[in-house]
Amino acid sequence: MMKISFIIATLNSGGAERALVTLANALCKEHEVSIIKFHAGESFYKLENEVKVTSLEQFRFDTLYHKIASRFKKFFALRKALKESKSDVFISFLDTTNIACIAAKIGLKTPLIISEHSNEAYLKPKIWRFLRRVSYPFCDALSVLGSSDKVYYERFVKRVKLLLNPCHFSDEISFDSSFEKENLVLFIGRLDHNKNPVMFLKAIAHLDKNLQENYKFVIAGDGQLRQELEYKVKSLGIKVDFLGRVENVKALYEKAKVLCLCSFVEGLPTVLIESLYFEVCRISSSYYNGAKDLIKDNHDGLLVGCDDEIALAKKLELVLNDENFRKELVNNAKQRCKDFEISHIKEEWLKLIAEVKNA
């Protein structure tokens, strides 16, 4: 039995958080698993009782002085937590947390695996890109989600492993499950610029009026653009239901016929994986830089240009008007399910942990 500590900023409703919780829940059956997080608050996703969660001490950030002082305090609190955990391996998630862990681990012998969950281009501030470039060579291993990211990081990181996110539904849904589908089209994700939900709304406005009337269009997620998007729905004269953050997305997948992803940049979008298990047809933007890792266009899903609402509307009309074609796409997509099974991904992680421990 090993002691494994995960480190992450929060356990909110993001895809990286979902992946961490799924992996922690799988590993805790055979190992002692803990999660160290920077911020207070409960996990959005259900954790097994065996997983121990601790939050670093919280500090003030209300003035410039406190912002600066608190960052130093947070760093030393992280280092203390790492030392006291007496872990066999550390696994950190997301870029800024990775950088902090590399610095906080200096002098400690415990190996550190860092995990990237966005495309390398997503980190925009130059200072953070610089810190990533100079710090990442000091990790013991780096896991990435896309083939293009693996090529990029191998230029300066000694051990880079392509590890897909596990789908927590893989233990719940059998391969031959069938679902009672409704005329439902989904958008699931944060309501921010990168997820580009306005593209979804504009595409709906371009659909044939009969399709607009006969289908229900739903956005599950919340974020800074919600009010702006609600105004946009009114100005376009369309009907869209805003559900906010949804804990039980399974119920939506079971009913939905189509899922749309409109992002500019992604790592390995959770929604494109989860939808495989529920016979939901996937239409995705050709986001930078890994859409083709998950979708073979016109075979197991459909790809459209980034921010091209006209193309999205045409692809939507294609599958909404041709149920046989939609079913062909989802049946082909189901062949990918085995790639994301929890048991398979867990074993891949254990192999990587063994590598860094024995290095």
Curated annotation (Swiss-Prot):
GO CC entries: plasma membrane
Q: Where can this protein be found?
A: Cell inner membrane
Give the principal location in a single coarse category: membrane
Report the record's Gene Ontology biological process terms. Answer: protein N-linked glycosylation via asparagine
Q: Does the keyword Cell membrane apply?
A: yes
List the Gene Ontology MF annotations in alphabetical order.
hexosyltransferase activity
Q: What is known of its domains?
A: Contains an amphipathic helix (''ruler helix'') that has a dual role of facilitating membrane attachment and glycan counting. The ruler helix contains three positively charged side chains (Lys-67, Arg-71 and Lys-74) that can bind the pyrophosphate group of the LLO substrate and thus limit the addition of GalNAc units to three.
Q: What is this protein called?
A: GalNAc-alpha-(1->4)-GalNAc-alpha-(1->3)-diNAcBac-PP-undecaprenol alpha-1,4-N-acetyl-D-galactosaminyltransferase
The species is Campylobacter jejuni subsp. jejuni serotype O:2 (strain ATCC 700819 / NCTC 11168)
